């Protein structure tokens, strides 16, 4: 199979937004207009193509990032008449599935940020925007739902500037809002676009309506000033009053969008089929191709030397696995982005994280959950492979004779856990295997065994996250399970630096055991996890025993010294030690490492940490006092408030332990009229009284 379009004609984009901003409907319309669909699906009737899991069809929300590909020939602009390939990832907007957004942004070259014209910039819009900033992803903004009562394009543009700190530049302004939304004014061409009342594929180009001419001129000047500010040649022409051509405006807009100094803003109503084709033109016109993004940086797995891979078919193959999924028909699917080279079905790749060589059985071009077999993939492509057994999310796969490790993905630790057991004893093994498969797919889902009770615990990013995974157990793996009440995933850390000697000696006939280590433990910045430094000099501990010390420390960190919770953000340095030529072993040093760490942690001012959530409540004004009083009673700290879309909003930081059952309480205190969103913010020290109560609980449990 030859390359269908040149690399500079490829766009890898994501569609990202707050829940219910219309992402899936917009993607459906894109697929319809690009010829991938012959009938449009609607989210509200469960017929949307991109929402392919049973739970997504029932709930009307997108949980996994479905990937698809389509082709588009722009009608206007510098790229008009040229066929382009657009690979699209439709990402979830619910905060419990932030990991899906994170991993798709990692492999994309651009994004369409959707905003609801009524709700404006909502909490999850901010979260997703920050994630896109982290990866430097160029964006265009599409203000959707212009047909809804209360729609306000200009308020949304203002909110993008104020709440997201971005530089939004409208390229269109709406003709009518709400029920009378008919189309828009194209500010580059200064023409009106009025849609016909069919499927939206036809429209009339008209002169700008008389009552909008002054406003259109004002916004065009605003656009020209914005593009002139980022280009000296254009600025000179603008100041001299010379005419600036349409081609010049588009070229400078493209450069500024790729640098994320300007966010082009468009408007439409995907549901009413208005604006989507012009948004596709903008995707091609302003978002990056793999050529614009340039070389990807990595390092050699053995020498650690930096390695760069150009986005060219002639380069050695390098790709990044960004998602694992289980398909009922073909088994394990590994979604990957090709950064360089060509990969053929049936060939071998090296996984540089495991050092193992694996064979690519088949390569599939995914269209939501449908698929077609293809012979090979080229630089810039996104596809799915069948046959990779040990590849995990974030692993690099590459040409075995030219190894490279691309930058890994970092995922947040789970904040909530529940006990789970099968309804029937016969399903015990099946439950274990099914949970392992789900954990392989989702890096923020963890499975562990409580050492004291023997219970299986599952941990995730929120109640909905775990609820859907338990639901998948039943639907996909035919395992029915009972689950306990949600528990907070507490953590522990230390506040002081301490040195401590860990010694393990056993003499009881036969071969003895001996290991002695001197450890220094010190606190790390929040979010840094764990760091182990080997500072041994002069061979006082043989090299082969040092990994065992590290393993012993990590084993001890799983059960902290305050209340038995995992410890985090700690640096451990192995300073000194002793060994015995006959009695020393890996096991002895592992135990010595564990003893040394526990002893040091007890003296290093250990503290208990709890997850703090960023909570935003949107409520009618008459319930504002009740909402604020209730948040304060939950140990919440009010951080700000304001007005949006005719309602009041309150931003606060609240411990997760105080938020269980909040949706029911909020519903009853506001007669169902308020809603809220919540996302993990950070870990913070638990108040002393609560920490002491949890310690007592642990002591009494140990005595039982």
Curated annotation (Swiss-Prot):
Ranges for domain tr-type G: 8-291
One Pfam family of this chain: EFG_C
Binding site for GTP: 17-24, 90-94, 144-147
Cellular localization per UniProt: Cytoplasm
InterPro entries, alphabetized: EFG_II, EFG_III, EFG_III/V, EFG_IV, EFG_V, EFG_V-like, EFTu-like_2, G_TR_CS
GO cellular component: cytoplasm
GO molecular function: GTP binding; GTPase activity; translation elongation factor activity
One Gene Ontology biological process: ribosome disassembly
Summary of the function given for this chain in its UniProt record: Catalyzes the GTP-dependent ribosomal translocation step during translation elongation. During this step, the ribosome changes from the pre-translocational (PRE) to the post-translocational (POST) state as the newly formed A-site-bound peptidyl-tRNA and P-site-bound deacylated tRNA move to the P and E sites, respectively. Catalyzes the coordinated movement of the two tRNA molecules, the mRNA and conformational changes in the ribosome.
Family according to the record: Belongs to the TRAFAC class translation factor GTPase superfamily. Classic translation factor GTPase family. EF-G/EF-2 subfamily.
HAMAP family, sorted: EF_G_EF_2_B (MF_00054_B)
UniProt cross-references to NCBIfam families, sorted A to Z: EF-G, PRK12740.1-3, PRK12740.1-5, small_GTP
Protein name per UniProt: Elongation factor G
Species of the source: Chlorobium limicola (strain DSM 245 / NBRC 103803 / 6330)
Upper classification of the organism: Bacteria, Pseudomonadati, Chlorobiota, Chlorobiia, Chlorobiales
